[in-house]
């Protein structure tokens, strides 16, 4: 297969050909109990074990025919030029508010001593105060902030590559993320598409950029087919960002003709739409039953392009299967309940990402092995399930879909 563009994602289930991952690194060893909440973790993964599990995830994708790229390697290659690297450091330090803690100049000087690979590892891992040469403290803020160990916070959530940017069609969104702990993450993708040889010559459309004032995250963005995108209105994604993205998609000659804005409960357990709802085949979906009302009802806003790109028709609907059938042109859909629909099992397995499947072809998904009830439910419906070990990976509260950013999928025949 000849790829004429580096980004091509017109479905959730097309055969996966290129995907971007981030191998967990030293950033996880900069987690401590005191700062877990600040850095959006509930526990501290054991690094050698989580790396082994992640390597098995990557190997599984390769065995299924996918090219695996790594965020850290792409970023380093994009920053090969010294001037671009210095520009990146300036932008990163500004966003990290390094000027507030008085360390901007020292951090910049420190980071410029590294080659691109080492510098990228350093900023992803975080910079502890004791890593810089000690100087006599003379400013009040220096004396008072000694208890906090970092000049630059680590980025332990980076192995969830789904969220900072998301491919839609031939372009992508580079997202303004909600939480300060993750906001710097999308800067890497901006530099990759602007400066990496694989991407920079292709004029890749950016449907929504990270400087937009409202939040959106990739875990809420699902490409259902070449004309339809579902986006979660969630704890992390705002209605305002969705509306702007819809207008940009309609006005900029994308193939997208409709967007389903799916409201889900705003809680950490249901962080993104893909933690409670994913597509596994042309007409089959996993769903966590707790996002629906007693009668299976929920709020779904269908935004459709009118006769002109500026004209948007919005309707509110409440029956997810009916909306999916109509918008995807299906005679029927099958919703497969996480945990088999059992109240306890579904809550337990959803917490460990039982609904967060990664489709690598129609009817073929990668899942966590610990969600054995959900996996069996998928198999009973004819889905091929490829399980990966998850004892440490799942501590980060994200599953196979969260840990992957598809860049190229073959079209669904």
UniProtKB/Swiss-Prot annotation:
InterPro entries: Arg_deiminase (IPR003876). Keywords: Arginine metabolism, Cytoplasm, Hydrolase. It catalyses: L-arginine + H2O = L-citrulline + NH4(+). Its EC number is 3.5.3.6. One of its GO terms (molecular function) is arginine deiminase activity. Pathway: Amino-acid degradation; L-arginine degradation via ADI pathway; carbamoyl phosphate from L-arginine: step 1/2. GO terms for cellular component: cytoplasm. Pfam families: ADI. It is an enzyme of class 3 (hydrolase). The active site is at residue 402. HAMAP family: Arg_deiminase (MF_00242). Belongs to the arginine deiminase family. This is Arginine deiminase. It comes from Bacillus licheniformis (strain ATCC 14580 / DSM 13 / JCM 2505 / CCUG 7422 / NBRC 12200 / NCIMB 9375 / NCTC 10341 / NRRL NRS-1264 / Gibson 46). The gene is arcA.
């Amino acid at each position: 297969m000849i790829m004429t563009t580096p980004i091509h994602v017109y479905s959730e289930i097309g055969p996966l050909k290129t995907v971007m991952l981030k191998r967990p690194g030293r950033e996880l060893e900069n987690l401590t109990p005191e700062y877990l909440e600040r850095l959006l973790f509930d526990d501290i993964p054991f690094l050698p074990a989580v790396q082994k599990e992640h390597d098995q995830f990557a190997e599984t994708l390769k065995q299924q025919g996918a090219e695996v790229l790594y965020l850290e390697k792409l970023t380093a290659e994009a920053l090969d030029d010294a001037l671009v690297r210095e520009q990146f450091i300036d932008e990163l330090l500004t966003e990290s508010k390094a000027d507030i803690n008085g360390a901007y100049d020292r951090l910049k000087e420190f980071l410029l001593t590294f080659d691109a690979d080492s510098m990228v590892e350093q900023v992803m891992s975080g910079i502890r105060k004791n890593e810089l040469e000690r100087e006599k403290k003379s400013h009040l803020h220096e004396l008072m902030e000694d208890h906090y160990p970092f000049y630059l916070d680590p980025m332990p959530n980076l192995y969830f590559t789904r969220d900072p940017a998301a491919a839609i069609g031939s372009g992508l969104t580079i997202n303004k993320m909600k939480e300060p702990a993750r906001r710097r993450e999308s800067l890497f993708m901006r530099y990759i598409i602007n400066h990496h040889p694989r991407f920079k010559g292709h004029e890749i459309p950016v449907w929504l950029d990270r400087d937009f004032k409202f939040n959106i995250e990739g875990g809420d963005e699902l490409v259902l087919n070449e004309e339809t995108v579902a986006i979660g209105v969630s704890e992390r994604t705002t209605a305002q960002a969705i509306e702007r993205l819809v207008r940009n998609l309609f006005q900029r000659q994308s193939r997208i003709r409709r967007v389903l804005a799916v409201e889900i409960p705003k809680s950490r357990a249901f962080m993104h739409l893909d933690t409670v709802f994913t597509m596994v085949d042309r007409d089959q979906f996993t769903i966590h039953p707790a996002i629906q009302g007693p009668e299976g009802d929920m709020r779904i806003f269908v935004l459709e392009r009118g006769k002109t790109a500026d004209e948007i028709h919005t309707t509110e609907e409440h029956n997810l299967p009916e909306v999916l059938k109509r918008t995807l042109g299906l005679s029927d859909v099958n919703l497969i309940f996480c945990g088999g629909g059992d109240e306890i099992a579904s809550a337990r397995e959803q917490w460990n990402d039982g609904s967060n499947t990664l489709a690598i072809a129609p009817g073929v998904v990668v899942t966590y092995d610990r969600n054995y009830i959900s996996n069996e439910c998928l198999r009973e419906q004819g889905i091929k399930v490829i399980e990966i070990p998850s004892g440490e990976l799942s501590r980060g509260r994200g599953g196979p879909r969260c840990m992957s950013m598809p860049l190229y999928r073959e079209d669904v025949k």
